[in-house]
Amino acid sequence: MRDYKQLNGLALAYVGDAIYEIYIRDYLVSLGQTKPNVLHRMATHYVSAKAQASLMQAMLAGEMLTEEEEVMYKRGRNAKSHTFAKNADVTTYRVATGFESLMGYLHLTQQKERLEELINWCIKKVGETNEK
């Protein structure tokens, strides 16, 4: 197995973006929604840069992450990217990239239980926000 601690933050984010999106899509379909346009609209509440940055900031404020997880978040956040989200400022985009980097790291290191714990927390948090 590869030493994923050495992997570039953007490579971790590349994987994390896909993994998080799959979990969110699975969750939304499990709610019984089948219309693609509605699913896409619902997914943006979870997967947009703004949503991911907000979730990441809440995790950090709640001291939910281990020291190692924070390092992986910072690796993605601080990575030099030449692309930016269309609908987010640079800071929001970088925090979201850090979020995706953490998800990618947990997946690649086969920490499925921890990955699912954090994703389930994110789903619950977004649900609470949408109820307000």
From Swiss-Prot:
GO terms for molecular function: ribonuclease III activity; rRNA binding. CDD domains: RIBOc. It comes from the Bacteria. The keyword Transcription does not apply. The keyword Cytoplasm applies. Its cofactor is Mg(2+). The active site is at 17. InterPro entries: Mini3_fam (IPR008226), RNase_III_dom (IPR000999), RNase_III_sf (IPR036389). One of its GO terms (biological process) is rRNA processing. Keywords: Cytoplasm, Endonuclease, Hydrolase, Magnesium, Nuclease, Ribosome biogenesis, RNA-binding, rRNA processing, rRNA-binding. GO terms for cellular component: cytoplasm. It is found in: Cytoplasm. SUPFAM superfamilies: RNase III domain-like. Its EC number is 3.1.26.-. It holds the Pfam family Ribonuclease_3. Homodimer. Involved in correct processing of both the 5' and 3' ends of 23S rRNA precursor. Processes 30S rRNA precursor transcript even in absence of ribonuclease 3 (Rnc); Rnc processes 30S rRNA into smaller rRNA precursors. Belongs to the MrnC RNase family. This is Mini-ribonuclease 3. The lineage of its organism: Bacteria, Bacillati, Bacillota, Bacilli, Lactobacillales. The gene is mrnC.
